[in-house]
Amino acid sequence: MEMNIFDIRSFKGSPQAEYGGAFHVSLPEIGPDLKAMGFNLMSRANNHTLDWGLEGMRETSQVLDQSGIIHARAGENLAQAGAARFLETARGRVALLSLATSFTPMSRAGDPAGEAPGRPGLNALRLAQGIVVPPEKSRA
C-alpha cells in the first residue's frame, strides 16, 4: 500500500522533507471500503511509509487495524516492523512478510539500545557486502 490514511483536515503531523516522491493520502473511510473489496492483507514497508512522518504511519496503522486488515507493518521498533503477520482462513494460514528496498534514510526502524527506546519506522532490507576469495586464489 503506497499511501497513508488519515483525515488531512484534522491531522496534527506534517509532510516530511524527504519523502517517496508524492504525498499520497486518503481519508479514513477508505479502510472499510478496502476491506469490503476483499483486501485482507497489505504490505506497508515502502518508500511512502513515512511521507507524513510517524504521525501518518501510526494513524494509517490505526485505520487498517480498525478495518480488520492485516498489515506487515511499519512499527514502533524493528521487532514490530519486521514481524510476520498472519491471516487465518478456512483453507489455512497465510503469512505476510514485508520489507522495503527503497526508503529515505530516517525511515528504518531500529531496535532498543539499553535505556533508549527503539526507533519507529519500516522494515528495511539490510544488506552486507562481502568478498569471498576461494582458498586456491588466496594462497601467496
Question: Residue spans of the language-model regions?
Answer:
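Acidic, metal/ion-coordinating pockets
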Residues: M1-A140
